Amino acid sequence: MATTNHVEHELLSKLIDELKVKANADPEADVLAGRLLHRLKAESVTHTVAEYLEVFSDKFYDEEFFQMHRDELETRVSAFAQSPAYERIVSSGYLSALRYYDTYLYVGRSGKQESVQHFYMRLAGFCASTTCLYAGLRAALQRARPEIESDMEVFDYYFEHLTSQTVCCSTPFMRFAGVENSTLASCILTTPDLSSEWDVTQALYRHLGRYLFQRAGVGVGVTGAGQDGKHISLLMRMINSHVEYHNYGCKRPVSVAAYMEPWHSQIFKFLETKLPENHERCPGIFTGLFVPELFFKLFRDTPWSDWYLFDPKDAGDLERLYGEEFEREYYRLVTAGKFCGRVSIKSLMFSIVNCAVKAGSPFILLKEACNAHFWRDLQGEAMNAANLCAEVLQPSRKSVATCNLANICLPRCLVNAPLAVRAQRADTQGDELLLALPRLSVTLPGEGAIGDGFSLARLRDATQCATFVVACSILQGSPTYDSRDMASMGLGVQGLADVFADLGWQYTDPPSRSLNKEIFEHMYFTALCTSSLIGLHTRKIFPGFKQSKYAGGWFHWHDWAGTDLSIPREIWSRLSERIVRDGLFNSQFIALMPTSGCAQVTGCSDAFYPFYANASTKVTNKEEALRPNRSFWRHVRLDDREALNLVGGRVSCLPEALRQRYLRFQTAFDYNQEDLIQMSRDRAPFVDQSQSHSLFLREEDAARASTLANLLVRSYELGLKTIMYYCRIEKAADLGVMECKASAALSVPREEQNERSPAEQMLPRPMEPAQVTGPVDIMSKGPGEGPGGWCVPGGLEVCYKYRQLFSEDDLLETDGFTERACESCQ
C-alpha cells in the first residue's frame, strides 16, 4: 500500500511539474495542475472534524464551540466539499493551490495540515464563536440579518460568505484566526522617539522586534532620527538587519517602511539606502516620504528656488504641523537661520525620481491631504508615517496604531456570479437604510460582456459581512496593543479590472469610471451603517467620537470639492442623524490595499489596479510560479490563442484587428497614467484612509525624469493622499519570459533583432557611489567647492557638469536653461 502511494505521489508530482510551466499559455493546464496539487496534498491534511479537533485542539482559543457543534460542522463541511463553491476554489489554478498549502493552511502535530474545507471552518468558527460570545455583536448581526437565530445560523452566515469568496480576509487573519494568543491586526504604525542613542535602542530592540516577531508589517516614522549626530544609514541598516533575521526561513516574510519628511538634513542619505548602486543598501525594507504641500508648490511654480534643510533638533514644530501652519513655521526657521543646508528644489525632486525609477520607492504621501481629511483635527500632532503599503493612516506618536483589514472580491458581485442562498439579502429584511438603496448598478454591460451587470446589493452584503468579520478580529484578536479601542478598519477590494473586463469595458471607459465611484460610495455607506449598528448594540463607541467630525454630521466626502453622489443626499442625511445619535464602533473604514496575496488565492486581479500582465510570474516562498490572467483567458477565442501566445499575451503587440478585440485586457502600462490618477481621485472622497496608488511606466518613459515628476505634481494637484505607493517599470526587453518563442524569433529579420543592443535599452547608467556625496554637502559650500571642484547651481544658469552628478544623459532636464560649464568647472 505504501509503495502504491509512493508511486502515485511521484506520478502526480511529475504531472504537476509538466503542467505548471504551461500555465501562461494553456489555461486548462493551469487548472489541472492546481487540482492535482490539491490531490497530492490530500493524504497530508485532516479529513474529518473529529480528526481536525484531535490534531489542533490545543491551538484553539475556543475549542468549546467546535466540540459543541461537531456533528453539525461535519455536515456543513461535507456539503461544502461537494458544492460548486469548492469546485471553483480547487479549479483556481496552480498558484492558488500553492498559496493555500505554502502560506495559509495551519500546520499541526507531525506536520499535519488542515484541509481547505477545515481552513474555512476555522475562520467561520472563530467569527461565529466571537459573535456569540459578545451579546451586543450578536444583537447587531440579528438587526442586520433578522433571519439569523441559532449559533449554527451565525456560523453559516460567515461560512458561506468566506467560502463563496465574496469576503476575503487579511493574511494574519487567514493564518491565525481561532488560534490562541494570536495577533490578527494587519498593520502596525509607530513614530517612536529617536532623539538619542538610548531612545533608538529602545525603539528597535524593545518594540520593533516584537512587532516583527508577531509577523506584522510595520510603518515607522524616522523624521526625528539623526539628533544624536549619527547617520540615518546606520539606523536603516539596523532596521534592515532586524527584518532579514525575522524573515529567514519564515513562511510569511514581513518588512518595514520607514517614513521621512524631505526637509530633513539627511534626506539624500535616506534616499540612497535603496539605490541599487549603493553597496550598503537595505533591500529588506522600504522608504517613504511625507511631502508637505509647500514642496510641490515650489517645484511647480519656481523649480530652481532653494529648499532648506534642517537638523531635526533645530526644526521647531515642522514635524507636527501641516498646511499654512507648516509654511509659517518653515519660513520662520529660514529667516532665523536655523537651516543647516539648502538645495535647488528641482535637484531634490529629481533625486527622488531617480530613486523611484531605480528602486520602486520611496512611497510618496501628501502630508496635508493625509492630515486635513482625518476624522479629527491633527494640527499640532500631525501624522507623518503610514503603514507598510501606504494605505493606512493613523497618528502613532502617543501610542502604537494598528489596523485590521479585509477586502471584497468584486467579481463575485457580478449578477451572474454563483452564490449561496444565504449570501443574498432578502428584499424585506435588514437595515432599512440599506434596503432603500438600488440593487443593481445603472451602468449597462458593453459589447462582448459575459456579465449581466453589477449587483450593488451583493456588494453591500459582502461589505456588511466584512465589517462584522473585522469587528470579531478587533474584539478577540489578542493583542492589538494600545489602539484596540480605536477599532480602525480598512476594507479594500480585489478584481476591479476583472469586473470592468467581464462587463465589456476598458479600464478607463466612461461606464468604468461611473461604476468605480459607485462601488466605493456604497462600500463606505454600508460600512458606516454597520459600524453604527455594532456601536449601538455593543455600547462600544470609539474614544474621541464626541470630539470627532462624525459627531457633527460630517462624512469624508464633505471635504472633497465637486463630489457627485449616486446615493441620494436625503439617505445620507438619515445616516448622519443615526450616527450622531448612536455613534460608531469603528473610527476608520475604507483603505485600498494591494491584496496581492489573497488575490492569488481567488485568481482575480490585484486590488483596484488595471491588469498588471496577461502572463506573468510570481515568486513564492518556495518557487517562481506562473500567474496567468484568468479573466483574459476566459474571453480568448480558441483560434486566437496561438497569436496571443506568440506575444506573451501583450495586447499592444497584436495586429490591429486582434488588438481591437482584446483592448479591455490592456495592461496598466498601456493606459495613460493621468487617467488612472483621475480614477483614484474619483473614488478618493469615499476612501477615508488611503489607497495604495501605484504608477506604471514603460522604460522609455521612465528614462525622462520629467515624466514621473509631472505625474507626481498632477497627483498633488488632485489632492491624493498617497501620491505614489510604488513605481513599476516595464522593461523594454522582457527578461521574464520563461518559454522560448522560436517561431516568433524566426519571423523577425536578423538585422532588426540586432538593431538595438541590450545596453541601449537600459536606463541611464547609474553613477558610482563614490562620485556623489550628496547635494546637501554641496550646498553647504561655496561655488566651485563641490565634489571634484564642480559648481553648485544658482540662478537660471545651470552647469551641465553639476547635472552629471545625478545622471549622464536625460535623467535631469534643462527645460530651456542655459547649458554651459561655469568658470569653476571649465
From Swiss-Prot:
EC number assigned by the record: 1.17.4.1
UniProt binding sites for substrate: 171, 186-187, 217, 387-391, 594-598
Catalytic activity: a 2'-deoxyribonucleoside 5'-diphosphate + [thioredoxin]-disulfide + H2O = a ribonucleoside 5'-diphosphate + [thioredoxin]-dithiol
Site description Important for hydrogen atom transfer, residues in chain: 187, 403
Site entry (Important for electron transfer), positions: 725-726
SUPFAM superfamilies: PFL-like glycyl radical enzymes
UniProt-listed InterPro entries: HSV_RIR1, NrdE_NrdA_C, RNR_lg_C, RNR_lsu_N, Rrm1
Enzyme class label: oxidoreductase
Residues under site feature: Interacts with thioredoxin/glutaredoxin: 822, 825
Pfam family, one: Ribonuc_red_lgC
MF annotations from Gene Ontology: ATP binding; ribonucleoside-diphosphate reductase activity, thioredoxin disulfide as acceptor
Its job: Ribonucleoside-diphosphate reductase holoenzyme provides the precursors necessary for viral DNA synthesis. Allows virus growth in non-dividing cells, as well as reactivation from latency in infected hosts. Catalyzes the biosynthesis of deoxyribonucleotides from the corresponding ribonucleotides.
Protein name, as recorded: Ribonucleoside-diphosphate reductase large subunit
Gene source species: Epstein-Barr virus (strain GD1) (HHV-4)
